[in-house]
Protein backbone atom coordinates (compact mmCIF):
# COMPACT_ATOMS: atom_id res chain seq x y z
CA UNK A 1 0.00 0.00 0.00
CA UNK A 2 2.78 2.40 0.98
CA UNK A 3 4.65 1.58 -2.20
CA UNK A 4 1.60 2.35 -4.32
CA UNK A 5 1.08 5.67 -2.55
CA UNK A 6 4.75 6.57 -2.93
CA UNK A 7 4.70 5.67 -6.64
CA UNK A 8 1.60 7.77 -7.18
CA UNK A 9 3.19 10.66 -5.30
CA UNK A 10 6.36 10.49 -7.42
CA UNK A 11 4.35 10.21 -10.65
CA UNK A 12 2.42 13.32 -9.66
CA UNK A 13 5.60 15.25 -9.04
CA UNK A 14 7.06 14.14 -12.37
CA UNK A 15 3.85 15.07 -14.18
CA UNK A 16 3.86 18.50 -12.59
CA UNK A 17 7.50 19.34 -13.31
CA UNK A 18 7.71 17.93 -16.87
CA UNK A 19 5.91 20.93 -18.44
CA UNK A 20 8.17 23.24 -16.46
CA UNK A 21 11.23 21.41 -17.76
CA UNK A 22 10.00 21.59 -21.33
CA UNK A 23 9.23 25.26 -20.90
CA UNK A 24 12.72 25.88 -19.61
CA UNK A 25 14.16 24.02 -22.58
CA UNK A 26 12.09 26.17 -24.95
CA UNK A 27 13.36 29.26 -23.17
CA UNK A 28 16.92 28.06 -23.69
CA UNK A 29 16.37 27.24 -27.37
CA UNK A 30 17.21 30.19 -29.67
CA UNK A 31 14.73 31.63 -32.12
CA UNK A 32 15.14 30.04 -35.56
CA UNK A 33 17.45 31.71 -38.03
CA UNK A 34 16.48 32.72 -41.54
CA UNK A 35 19.73 31.40 -42.99
CA UNK A 36 22.54 29.15 -41.78
CA UNK A 37 25.88 28.77 -43.56
CA UNK A 38 27.82 25.74 -42.30
CA UNK A 39 30.96 23.70 -43.01
CA UNK A 40 32.91 26.69 -44.23
CA UNK A 41 36.16 28.46 -43.42
CA UNK A 42 34.75 31.61 -41.85
CA UNK A 43 37.41 34.29 -41.42
CA UNK A 44 35.69 36.72 -39.07
CA UNK A 45 38.20 39.63 -39.04
CA UNK A 46 37.30 40.16 -35.39
CA UNK A 47 39.88 41.44 -32.89
CA UNK A 48 41.83 38.16 -33.00
CA UNK A 49 41.09 37.15 -36.62
CA UNK A 50 39.13 34.12 -35.44
CA UNK A 51 38.61 31.35 -37.98
CA UNK A 52 35.44 29.32 -37.46
CA UNK A 53 32.93 27.19 -39.41
CA UNK A 54 29.45 28.63 -39.51
CA UNK A 55 27.09 31.57 -39.10
CA UNK A 56 23.39 31.93 -38.43
CA UNK A 57 21.50 34.99 -39.67
CA UNK A 58 18.15 36.41 -38.60
CA UNK A 59 16.51 39.69 -39.61
CA UNK A 60 19.61 40.77 -41.50
CA UNK A 61 22.03 40.35 -38.56
CA UNK A 62 24.43 37.67 -37.39
CA UNK A 63 22.88 35.86 -34.40
CA UNK A 64 25.50 33.13 -34.17
CA UNK A 65 29.13 32.68 -35.23
CA UNK A 66 30.87 29.42 -34.35
CA UNK A 67 30.83 25.69 -34.99
CA UNK A 68 28.62 24.01 -37.56
CA UNK A 69 27.15 21.77 -34.86
CA UNK A 70 26.05 24.67 -32.69
CA UNK A 71 24.80 26.66 -35.67
CA UNK A 72 22.23 23.95 -36.34
CA UNK A 73 20.57 24.77 -33.01
CA UNK A 74 19.20 27.79 -34.87
CA UNK A 75 17.51 25.65 -37.48
CA UNK A 76 13.73 25.97 -37.72
CA UNK A 77 11.07 24.77 -40.12
CA UNK A 78 11.67 27.71 -42.47
CA UNK A 79 15.43 28.08 -42.02
CA UNK A 80 17.51 27.76 -45.17
CA UNK A 81 20.73 25.81 -44.60
CA UNK A 82 23.63 26.05 -47.05
CA UNK A 83 26.56 23.63 -46.92
CA UNK A 84 29.64 25.66 -47.90
CA UNK A 85 31.74 22.53 -48.39
CA UNK A 86 34.88 24.18 -47.11
CA UNK A 87 34.64 27.43 -49.05
CA UNK A 88 36.25 30.60 -47.67
CA UNK A 89 34.00 33.24 -46.10
CA UNK A 90 34.95 36.76 -45.06
CA UNK A 91 33.10 40.02 -44.35
CA UNK A 92 31.76 41.80 -47.42
CA UNK A 93 34.32 44.13 -48.97
CA UNK A 94 33.98 47.80 -48.00
CA UNK A 95 35.33 49.97 -50.83
CA UNK A 96 36.62 53.26 -49.42
CA UNK A 97 36.47 55.32 -52.62
CA UNK A 98 34.25 55.12 -55.70
CA UNK A 99 32.71 57.53 -58.17
CA UNK A 100 29.55 55.52 -58.62
CA UNK A 101 27.71 57.68 -61.17
CA UNK A 102 30.79 57.82 -63.41
CA UNK A 103 31.32 54.09 -63.01
CA UNK A 104 27.70 53.39 -63.90
CA UNK A 105 28.08 55.41 -67.11
CA UNK A 106 31.46 53.82 -67.83
CA UNK A 107 29.94 50.35 -67.55
CA UNK A 108 27.24 51.28 -70.03
CA UNK A 109 29.74 51.88 -72.82
CA UNK A 110 33.52 52.06 -72.92
CA UNK A 111 36.11 50.82 -75.39
CA UNK A 112 39.19 51.65 -73.32
CA UNK A 113 40.52 48.10 -73.67
CA UNK A 114 39.15 47.37 -77.15
CA UNK A 115 41.91 46.06 -79.40
CA UNK A 116 39.94 44.98 -82.47
CA UNK A 117 37.03 46.17 -84.57
CA UNK A 118 35.17 43.01 -83.55
CA UNK A 119 35.37 44.03 -79.88
CA UNK A 120 34.23 47.54 -80.75
CA UNK A 121 31.25 46.30 -82.77
CA UNK A 122 30.27 43.84 -80.02
CA UNK A 123 30.22 46.60 -77.41
CA UNK A 124 28.18 48.87 -79.66
CA UNK A 125 25.67 46.05 -80.24
CA UNK A 126 25.41 45.57 -76.50
CA UNK A 127 24.72 49.20 -75.64
CA UNK A 128 22.25 49.59 -78.53
CA UNK A 129 20.31 46.57 -77.24
CA UNK A 130 19.86 48.25 -73.87
CA UNK A 131 19.01 51.83 -74.86
CA UNK A 132 15.65 53.23 -76.02
CA UNK A 133 15.64 54.75 -79.49
CA UNK A 134 16.95 58.28 -79.64
CA UNK A 135 19.27 57.99 -76.65
CA UNK A 136 22.82 59.20 -77.25
CA UNK A 137 25.77 56.81 -77.03
CA UNK A 138 28.69 58.56 -75.35
CA UNK A 139 31.97 57.75 -73.62
CA UNK A 140 34.48 55.58 -75.40
CA UNK A 141 37.99 56.49 -74.16
CA UNK A 142 39.71 54.43 -76.83
CA UNK A 143 43.50 54.28 -77.09
CA UNK A 144 44.30 54.60 -73.38
CA UNK A 145 46.46 51.47 -73.37
CA UNK A 146 47.95 51.84 -76.84
CA UNK A 147 50.78 53.90 -75.40
CA UNK A 148 52.09 50.94 -73.38
CA UNK A 149 53.88 47.96 -74.87
CA UNK A 150 52.35 45.99 -72.01
CA UNK A 151 49.94 47.72 -69.69
CA UNK A 152 49.50 46.78 -66.06
CA UNK A 153 46.56 44.60 -67.01
CA UNK A 154 48.49 42.78 -69.68
CA UNK A 155 46.27 44.47 -72.24
CA UNK A 156 48.82 46.85 -73.70
CA UNK A 157 49.35 46.78 -77.46
CA UNK A 158 51.92 48.10 -79.90
CA UNK A 159 49.43 48.78 -82.69
CA UNK A 160 47.09 51.71 -82.15
CA UNK A 161 43.37 50.97 -82.27
CA UNK A 162 40.92 53.37 -83.93
CA UNK A 163 37.19 52.57 -83.98
CA UNK A 164 35.70 52.18 -87.46
CA UNK A 165 32.55 54.28 -87.29
CA UNK A 166 31.33 53.10 -90.68
CA UNK A 167 31.22 49.53 -89.31
CA UNK A 168 28.55 50.55 -86.77
CA UNK A 169 26.58 53.04 -88.87
CA UNK A 170 23.64 50.72 -89.48
CA UNK A 171 23.69 49.48 -85.88
CA UNK A 172 23.46 53.01 -84.51
CA UNK A 173 21.00 54.57 -86.97
CA UNK A 174 18.52 55.20 -84.13
CA UNK A 175 21.15 56.51 -81.72
CA UNK A 176 23.29 59.62 -82.17
CA UNK A 177 26.84 58.65 -81.21
CA UNK A 178 29.58 60.94 -79.90
CA UNK A 179 32.61 59.20 -78.42
CA UNK A 180 36.08 60.36 -77.50
CA UNK A 181 39.68 59.23 -77.43
CA UNK A 182 41.09 58.94 -73.90
CA UNK A 183 43.05 62.21 -74.18
CA UNK A 184 40.36 64.18 -76.07
CA UNK A 185 42.70 64.55 -79.05
CA UNK A 186 40.10 62.97 -81.32
CA UNK A 187 36.35 62.36 -81.40
CA UNK A 188 34.14 60.03 -83.41
CA UNK A 189 30.53 60.53 -84.47
CA UNK A 190 27.92 58.76 -86.56
CA UNK A 191 25.57 60.17 -89.18
CA UNK A 192 22.77 60.69 -86.64
CA UNK A 193 24.99 62.93 -84.54
CA UNK A 194 25.97 65.00 -87.57
CA UNK A 195 22.37 65.39 -88.64
CA UNK A 196 21.54 66.59 -85.14
CA UNK A 197 23.69 69.67 -85.79
CA UNK A 198 22.32 70.16 -89.29
CA UNK A 199 25.16 68.53 -91.22
CA UNK A 200 24.57 66.05 -94.04
CA UNK A 201 27.30 63.41 -93.63
CA UNK A 202 26.91 62.28 -97.24
CA UNK A 203 27.76 65.71 -98.67
CA UNK A 204 31.11 65.39 -100.47
CA UNK A 205 31.86 69.00 -99.49
CA UNK A 206 31.47 68.19 -95.84
CA UNK A 207 33.42 71.06 -94.27
CA UNK A 208 31.67 73.54 -96.58
CA UNK A 209 28.28 72.03 -95.77
CA UNK A 210 29.07 72.08 -92.08
CA UNK A 211 30.09 75.70 -92.25
CA UNK A 212 26.85 76.55 -94.03
CA UNK A 213 24.88 74.75 -91.33
CA UNK A 214 26.63 76.71 -88.61
CA UNK A 215 26.03 79.98 -90.43
CA UNK A 216 22.33 79.14 -90.62
CA UNK A 217 22.19 78.56 -86.87
CA UNK A 218 23.86 81.92 -86.36
CA UNK A 219 21.20 83.63 -88.48
CA UNK A 220 18.48 81.90 -86.48
CA UNK A 221 20.12 82.89 -83.22
CA UNK A 222 20.31 79.29 -82.01
CA UNK A 223 24.08 78.84 -82.17
CA UNK A 224 25.59 77.85 -78.81
CA UNK A 225 28.22 80.18 -77.49
CA UNK A 226 31.66 79.32 -78.80
CA UNK A 227 30.57 77.21 -81.76
CA UNK A 228 33.14 77.48 -84.51
CA UNK A 229 33.27 75.19 -87.51
CA UNK A 230 36.71 76.61 -88.30
CA UNK A 231 38.03 74.69 -85.29
CA UNK A 232 36.87 71.30 -86.56
CA UNK A 233 38.89 68.97 -88.78
CA UNK A 234 36.91 66.28 -90.62
CA UNK A 235 39.23 63.28 -91.08
CA UNK A 236 39.14 61.36 -94.35
CA UNK A 237 40.56 58.07 -95.57
CA UNK A 238 42.89 57.59 -98.55
CA UNK A 239 39.88 57.63 -100.87
CA UNK A 240 38.70 60.97 -99.58
CA UNK A 241 35.70 59.62 -97.65
CA UNK A 242 34.82 61.01 -94.24
CA UNK A 243 35.74 58.47 -91.54
CA UNK A 244 33.45 59.76 -88.82
CA UNK A 245 36.44 61.09 -86.88
CA UNK A 246 36.93 64.71 -85.88
CA UNK A 247 39.73 66.74 -84.37
CA UNK A 248 40.14 70.28 -83.18
CA UNK A 249 39.21 72.76 -80.51
CA UNK A 250 35.78 73.38 -82.03
CA UNK A 251 34.44 69.82 -81.86
CA UNK A 252 32.84 70.07 -78.43
CA UNK A 253 31.25 73.44 -79.13
CA UNK A 254 29.87 72.18 -82.44
CA UNK A 255 27.86 69.51 -80.61
CA UNK A 256 27.27 71.38 -77.36
CA UNK A 257 23.70 72.36 -78.20
CA UNK A 258 22.52 68.82 -79.02
CA UNK A 259 24.36 66.51 -76.64
CA UNK A 260 22.28 66.04 -73.48
CA UNK A 261 23.78 67.85 -70.51
CA UNK A 262 22.62 65.00 -68.29
CA UNK A 263 21.13 61.57 -68.70
CA UNK A 264 17.43 61.01 -68.10
CA UNK A 265 16.42 59.83 -64.65
CA UNK A 266 15.27 56.48 -66.03
CA UNK A 267 18.60 55.95 -67.77
CA UNK A 268 20.51 56.75 -64.61
CA UNK A 269 18.30 54.38 -62.65
CA UNK A 270 19.16 51.57 -65.03
CA UNK A 271 22.85 52.49 -65.02
CA UNK A 272 22.80 52.28 -61.23
CA UNK A 273 21.08 48.89 -61.27
CA UNK A 274 23.76 47.60 -63.64
CA UNK A 275 26.54 49.01 -61.47
CA UNK A 276 25.06 47.43 -58.34
CA UNK A 277 25.02 44.10 -60.15
CA UNK A 278 28.68 44.61 -61.05
CA UNK A 279 29.86 45.28 -57.51
CA UNK A 280 27.92 42.49 -55.87
CA UNK A 281 29.46 39.89 -58.19
CA UNK A 282 32.81 40.91 -56.68
CA UNK A 283 31.62 40.64 -53.08
CA UNK A 284 31.48 44.40 -52.48
CA UNK A 285 28.76 45.19 -49.95
CA UNK A 286 29.57 48.81 -49.04
CA UNK A 287 30.93 51.75 -51.05
CA UNK A 288 32.01 55.25 -50.10
CA UNK A 289 30.72 57.39 -52.95
CA UNK A 290 31.43 60.93 -54.18
CA UNK A 291 28.74 61.33 -56.83
CA UNK A 292 26.16 64.09 -57.31
CA UNK A 293 22.93 64.64 -55.39
CA UNK A 294 20.83 62.92 -58.06
CA UNK A 295 22.78 59.74 -57.41
CA UNK A 296 21.89 60.02 -53.72
CA UNK A 297 18.22 60.39 -54.68
CA UNK A 298 18.53 57.29 -56.87
CA UNK A 299 19.98 55.30 -53.96
CA UNK A 300 17.01 56.33 -51.83
CA UNK A 301 14.56 55.43 -54.57
CA UNK A 302 16.11 51.99 -55.02
CA UNK A 303 16.24 51.43 -51.26
CA UNK A 304 12.55 52.24 -50.96
CA UNK A 305 11.83 49.76 -53.76
CA UNK A 306 13.96 47.06 -52.12
CA UNK A 307 16.53 47.14 -54.93
CA UNK A 308 19.53 48.61 -53.13
CA UNK A 309 22.02 45.75 -52.76
CA UNK A 310 24.94 47.65 -51.24
CA UNK A 311 25.32 50.05 -48.35
CA UNK A 312 26.27 53.60 -49.25
CA UNK A 313 28.54 56.07 -47.46
CA UNK A 314 27.92 59.34 -49.32
CA UNK A 315 30.33 62.31 -49.44
CA UNK A 316 29.49 65.74 -50.92
CA UNK A 317 32.16 68.40 -51.45
CA UNK A 318 33.88 70.12 -48.51
CA UNK A 319 32.73 73.53 -49.78
CA UNK A 320 29.15 72.45 -48.95
CA UNK A 321 29.81 72.13 -45.23
CA UNK A 322 27.37 74.90 -44.21
CA UNK A 323 24.58 73.50 -46.36
CA UNK A 324 25.07 70.09 -44.76
CA UNK A 325 25.22 71.60 -41.29
CA UNK A 326 22.07 73.67 -41.85
CA UNK A 327 20.27 70.46 -42.82
CA UNK A 328 21.29 68.90 -39.52
CA UNK A 329 23.72 66.46 -41.11
CA UNK A 330 26.73 65.34 -39.07
CA UNK A 331 28.79 62.21 -38.53
CA UNK A 332 26.43 59.25 -38.20
CA UNK A 333 23.46 60.80 -40.03
CA UNK A 334 21.35 58.36 -42.00
CA UNK A 335 20.82 54.66 -41.37
CA UNK A 336 22.53 51.31 -41.92
CA UNK A 337 21.91 51.54 -45.68
CA UNK A 338 22.63 55.16 -46.58
CA UNK A 339 25.00 57.11 -44.35
CA UNK A 340 26.04 60.77 -44.54
CA UNK A 341 28.21 63.05 -42.43
CA UNK A 342 31.51 63.13 -44.33
CA UNK A 343 32.80 65.68 -46.86
CA UNK A 344 35.42 65.42 -49.61
CA UNK A 345 38.03 68.09 -50.31
CA UNK A 346 41.05 68.33 -52.61
CA UNK A 347 44.53 69.72 -51.99
CA UNK A 348 46.35 68.99 -55.25
CA UNK A 349 46.10 67.30 -58.66
CA UNK A 350 46.98 63.77 -59.77
CA UNK A 351 50.04 61.82 -60.89
CA UNK A 352 48.56 60.92 -64.27
CA UNK A 353 48.61 64.55 -65.44
CA UNK A 354 51.72 65.55 -63.43
CA UNK A 355 49.64 67.95 -61.32
CA UNK A 356 50.21 66.28 -57.92
CA UNK A 357 52.04 68.82 -55.75
CA UNK A 358 55.71 68.15 -54.83
CA UNK A 359 58.37 70.06 -52.90
CA UNK A 360 60.85 69.52 -55.75
CA UNK A 361 60.03 69.61 -59.44
CA UNK A 362 59.17 66.55 -61.46
CA UNK A 363 62.27 64.65 -62.56
CA UNK A 364 61.16 64.78 -66.19
CA UNK A 365 59.96 68.41 -65.91
CA UNK A 366 62.02 70.20 -63.21
CA UNK A 367 60.12 73.50 -63.34
CA UNK A 368 56.80 71.77 -62.68
CA UNK A 369 55.90 71.25 -59.00
CA UNK A 370 52.27 70.37 -59.67
CA UNK A 371 49.15 72.38 -58.91
CA UNK A 372 47.03 73.33 -55.95
CA UNK A 373 43.26 72.83 -56.23
CA UNK A 374 40.78 75.77 -56.19
CA UNK A 375 40.11 75.65 -52.43
CA UNK A 376 43.83 76.33 -51.92
CA UNK A 377 44.23 79.35 -54.22
CA UNK A 378 42.72 82.71 -55.19
CA UNK A 379 40.99 83.52 -58.48
CA UNK A 380 44.38 83.97 -60.16
CA UNK A 381 45.72 80.62 -58.99
CA UNK A 382 47.96 82.02 -56.27
CA UNK A 383 48.34 79.97 -53.08
CA UNK A 384 46.36 81.47 -50.19
CA UNK A 385 47.69 80.58 -46.75
CA UNK A 386 44.91 79.34 -44.49
CA UNK A 387 42.08 79.29 -47.05
CA UNK A 388 41.66 75.51 -47.02
CA UNK A 389 42.27 75.40 -43.27
CA UNK A 390 39.28 77.71 -42.75
CA UNK A 391 37.02 75.17 -44.49
CA UNK A 392 38.44 72.43 -42.29
CA UNK A 393 37.90 74.38 -39.07
CA UNK A 394 34.31 75.25 -39.94
CA UNK A 395 33.33 71.78 -41.14
CA UNK A 396 34.94 70.15 -38.11
CA UNK A 397 33.19 72.55 -35.73
CA UNK A 398 29.89 71.58 -37.37
CA UNK A 399 30.49 67.92 -36.49
CA UNK A 400 31.30 66.75 -40.00
CA UNK A 401 34.07 64.31 -40.95
CA UNK A 402 36.71 65.46 -43.42
CA UNK A 403 38.23 63.33 -46.14
CA UNK A 404 40.86 65.17 -48.18
CA UNK A 405 42.63 64.23 -51.42
CA UNK A 406 46.42 64.65 -51.23
CA UNK A 407 48.86 62.91 -53.59
CA UNK A 408 52.25 64.64 -53.83
CA UNK A 409 54.69 64.82 -50.90
CA UNK A 410 54.15 68.57 -50.41
CA UNK A 411 50.37 68.18 -50.52
CA UNK A 412 50.46 65.46 -47.86
CA UNK A 413 52.83 67.48 -45.68
CA UNK A 414 50.72 70.65 -45.90
CA UNK A 415 47.59 68.68 -45.08
CA UNK A 416 49.23 67.21 -41.98
CA UNK A 417 50.20 70.75 -40.95
CA UNK A 418 46.56 71.76 -41.26
CA UNK A 419 45.46 68.79 -39.17
CA UNK A 420 47.90 69.78 -36.43
CA UNK A 421 46.46 73.30 -36.48
CA UNK A 422 42.94 71.88 -36.43
CA UNK A 423 43.79 69.97 -33.27
CA UNK A 424 45.25 73.11 -31.72
CA UNK A 425 42.27 75.33 -32.47
CA UNK A 426 39.32 72.91 -32.21
CA UNK A 427 40.82 70.46 -29.75
CA UNK A 428 41.92 66.84 -30.07
CA UNK A 429 39.11 64.32 -30.54
CA UNK A 430 38.22 61.16 -32.47
CA UNK A 431 37.92 62.72 -35.93
CA UNK A 432 39.12 59.79 -38.03
CA UNK A 433 40.50 62.32 -40.48
CA UNK A 434 40.79 60.56 -43.83
CA UNK A 435 43.88 61.39 -45.85
CA UNK A 436 42.72 60.33 -49.31
CA UNK A 437 45.21 58.57 -51.63
CA UNK A 438 48.43 59.50 -49.72
CA UNK A 439 50.31 58.35 -52.80
CA UNK A 440 53.73 59.89 -52.13
CA UNK A 441 54.73 60.73 -48.56
CA UNK A 442 57.98 62.32 -47.37
CA UNK A 443 59.97 60.08 -44.94
CA UNK A 444 59.49 62.43 -41.97
CA UNK A 445 55.71 62.54 -42.41
CA UNK A 446 54.92 58.88 -41.78
CA UNK A 447 55.37 59.29 -38.02
CA UNK A 448 53.14 62.35 -38.08
CA UNK A 449 50.38 60.33 -39.74
CA UNK A 450 50.38 57.88 -36.86
CA UNK A 451 50.70 60.53 -34.16
CA UNK A 452 47.72 62.44 -35.57
CA UNK A 453 45.54 59.32 -35.82
CA UNK A 454 45.12 59.63 -39.56
CA UNK A 455 43.03 57.16 -41.55
CA UNK A 456 44.93 56.58 -44.80
CA UNK A 457 42.29 56.05 -47.49
CA UNK A 458 44.38 54.37 -50.18
CA UNK A 459 43.65 52.45 -53.37
CA UNK A 460 46.34 49.79 -53.84
CA UNK A 461 45.63 49.06 -57.51
CA UNK A 462 46.96 52.57 -58.25
CA UNK A 463 50.32 51.01 -57.42
CA UNK A 464 50.06 48.31 -60.07
CA UNK A 465 49.07 50.88 -62.66
CA UNK A 466 51.41 53.76 -61.79
CA UNK A 467 54.67 51.95 -61.06
CA UNK A 468 55.29 51.69 -64.81
CA UNK A 469 56.21 55.37 -65.01
CA UNK A 470 56.51 56.65 -61.43
CA UNK A 471 60.31 56.68 -61.26
CA UNK A 472 60.51 58.49 -64.58
CA UNK A 473 58.43 61.32 -63.13
CA UNK A 474 59.69 61.64 -59.56
CA UNK A 475 62.90 59.58 -59.44
CA UNK A 476 63.77 56.51 -57.40
CA UNK A 477 64.43 58.26 -54.08
CA UNK A 478 61.02 59.89 -53.83
CA UNK A 479 59.41 56.71 -55.16
CA UNK A 480 60.47 54.97 -51.93
CA UNK A 481 57.60 56.83 -50.28
CA UNK A 482 55.08 55.96 -53.00
CA UNK A 483 52.18 53.69 -52.01
CA UNK A 484 54.18 52.89 -48.89
CA UNK A 485 51.48 50.80 -47.22
CA UNK A 486 53.82 49.08 -44.73
CA UNK A 487 55.27 52.39 -43.54
CA UNK A 488 51.78 53.85 -43.17
CA UNK A 489 50.58 50.87 -41.14
CA UNK A 490 53.72 50.73 -39.00
CA UNK A 491 53.32 54.43 -38.17
CA UNK A 492 50.11 53.66 -36.30
CA UNK A 493 47.84 55.21 -38.91
CA UNK A 494 44.78 53.19 -39.92
CA UNK A 495 45.09 51.74 -43.42
CA UNK A 496 41.86 51.26 -45.37
CA UNK A 497 41.44 50.09 -48.97
CA UNK A 498 39.28 50.77 -52.00
CA UNK A 499 39.53 51.20 -55.77
CA UNK A 500 38.75 54.73 -57.05
CA UNK A 501 36.39 52.97 -59.47
CA UNK A 502 36.06 53.50 -62.45
CA UNK A 503 39.41 55.34 -62.74
CA UNK A 504 40.34 58.13 -65.11
CA UNK A 505 40.00 58.64 -68.86
CA UNK A 506 43.51 57.15 -69.18
CA UNK A 507 43.39 54.26 -66.69
CA UNK A 508 40.68 51.86 -65.62
CA UNK A 509 40.49 50.91 -61.93
CA UNK A 510 38.17 47.87 -61.72
CA UNK A 511 35.94 47.36 -58.69
CA UNK A 512 37.36 43.83 -58.15
CA UNK A 513 38.94 43.75 -54.64
CA UNK A 514 41.22 40.87 -55.65
CA UNK A 515 43.26 43.29 -57.76
CA UNK A 516 43.82 45.59 -54.80
CA UNK A 517 44.73 42.73 -52.48
CA UNK A 518 47.15 41.45 -55.10
CA UNK A 519 48.82 44.85 -55.43
CA UNK A 520 49.17 45.26 -51.67
CA UNK A 521 50.77 41.86 -51.03
CA UNK A 522 52.87 41.56 -54.20
CA UNK A 523 53.63 45.14 -55.35
CA UNK A 524 53.66 43.90 -58.93
CA UNK A 525 51.82 44.68 -62.14
CA UNK A 526 49.20 42.16 -63.16
CA UNK A 527 51.76 40.69 -65.54
CA UNK A 528 54.01 39.91 -62.54
CA UNK A 529 56.60 42.67 -62.90
CA UNK A 530 59.04 43.34 -61.38
CA UNK A 531 59.84 39.81 -60.26
CA UNK A 532 60.52 40.66 -56.62
CA UNK A 533 57.98 43.45 -56.36
CA UNK A 534 58.47 47.22 -56.58
CA UNK A 535 60.08 48.31 -53.28
CA UNK A 536 59.10 44.93 -51.78
CA UNK A 537 59.80 46.12 -48.23
CA UNK A 538 56.43 47.91 -48.47
CA UNK A 539 54.43 44.70 -48.98
CA UNK A 540 51.89 43.90 -46.28
CA UNK A 541 50.47 40.56 -45.13
CA UNK A 542 47.27 39.11 -46.54
CA UNK A 543 45.55 39.35 -43.16
CA UNK A 544 46.41 43.05 -42.92
CA UNK A 545 45.22 43.61 -46.49
CA UNK A 546 41.89 41.88 -45.81
CA UNK A 547 41.39 43.94 -42.65
CA UNK A 548 42.11 47.12 -44.62
CA UNK A 549 39.40 46.14 -47.12
CA UNK A 550 36.77 45.22 -44.52
CA UNK A 551 36.92 46.29 -40.88
CA UNK A 552 39.18 49.32 -41.33
CA UNK A 553 36.94 50.96 -43.92
CA UNK A 554 33.98 50.41 -41.59
CA UNK A 555 36.08 52.09 -38.88
CA UNK A 556 36.87 54.96 -41.25
CA UNK A 557 33.10 55.42 -41.69
CA UNK A 558 32.45 55.35 -37.90
CA UNK A 559 30.56 52.10 -38.48
CA UNK A 560 32.85 49.44 -37.02
CA UNK A 561 30.25 48.58 -34.35
CA UNK A 562 27.74 47.44 -36.96
CA UNK A 563 29.82 46.15 -39.90
CA UNK A 564 33.28 45.20 -41.13
CA UNK A 565 33.61 41.86 -39.32
CA UNK A 566 31.56 38.72 -38.85
CA UNK A 567 30.33 39.04 -35.27
CA UNK A 568 27.02 38.60 -33.49
CA UNK A 569 24.69 41.64 -33.75
CA UNK A 570 26.51 43.07 -36.78
CA UNK A 571 24.85 43.36 -40.19
CA UNK A 572 25.07 40.10 -42.12
CA UNK A 573 27.21 41.20 -45.05
CA UNK A 574 29.67 38.62 -46.36
CA UNK A 575 31.33 37.09 -49.40
CA UNK A 576 32.01 33.42 -50.16
CA UNK A 577 35.11 32.80 -52.28
CA UNK A 578 36.50 29.93 -54.31
CA UNK A 579 39.88 30.00 -52.54
CA UNK A 580 41.26 30.45 -49.03
CA UNK A 581 42.99 33.83 -49.32
CA UNK A 582 45.25 33.03 -46.38
CA UNK A 583 46.77 29.97 -48.05
CA UNK A 584 47.32 30.97 -51.67
CA UNK A 585 50.05 32.79 -53.57
CA UNK A 586 49.47 36.38 -54.71
CA UNK A 587 49.12 35.21 -58.33
CA UNK A 588 46.23 32.93 -57.35
CA UNK A 589 44.28 35.97 -56.18
CA UNK A 590 43.79 36.90 -59.82
CA UNK A 591 41.86 33.66 -60.41
CA UNK A 592 39.80 33.83 -57.21
CA UNK A 593 36.07 34.30 -57.74
CA UNK A 594 33.18 35.30 -55.51
CA UNK A 595 30.56 32.55 -55.57
CA UNK A 596 28.11 34.22 -53.21
CA UNK A 597 27.50 37.71 -51.84
CA UNK A 598 25.13 38.31 -48.94
CA UNK A 599 23.94 41.77 -47.90
CA UNK A 600 21.68 42.18 -44.90
CA UNK A 601 21.15 38.44 -44.75
CA UNK A 602 19.91 38.23 -48.34
CA UNK A 603 21.77 36.45 -51.13
CA UNK A 604 22.29 39.12 -53.80
CA UNK A 605 24.81 37.20 -55.93
CA UNK A 606 25.17 33.47 -56.41
CA UNK A 607 22.76 30.69 -55.57
Regions from the PLM with identified roles:
Residues 303-306, 329-338, 426-428, 449-453:
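Acidic (Asp/Glu)-rich catalytic clusters
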Amino acid sequence: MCNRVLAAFIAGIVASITPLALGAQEMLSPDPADLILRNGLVYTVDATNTMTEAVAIRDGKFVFVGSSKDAMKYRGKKTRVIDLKGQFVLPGFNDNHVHFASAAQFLEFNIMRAATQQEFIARVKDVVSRLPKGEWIMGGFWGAYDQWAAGSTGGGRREAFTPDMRAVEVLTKDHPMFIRKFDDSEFAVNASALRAVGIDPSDPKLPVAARAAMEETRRQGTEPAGSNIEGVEFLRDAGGRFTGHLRGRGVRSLFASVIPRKFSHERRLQQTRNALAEIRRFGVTNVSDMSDDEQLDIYRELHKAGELTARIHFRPGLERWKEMSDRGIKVGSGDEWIRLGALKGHIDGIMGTSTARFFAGYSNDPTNHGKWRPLMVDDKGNFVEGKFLRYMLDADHAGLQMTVHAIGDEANSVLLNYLEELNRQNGVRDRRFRLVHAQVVAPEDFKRMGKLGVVAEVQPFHLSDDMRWMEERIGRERSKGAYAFKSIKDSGAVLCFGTDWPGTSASEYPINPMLGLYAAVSRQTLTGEPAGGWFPEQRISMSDAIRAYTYNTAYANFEEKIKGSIEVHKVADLAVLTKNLLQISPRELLDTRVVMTIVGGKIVHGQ
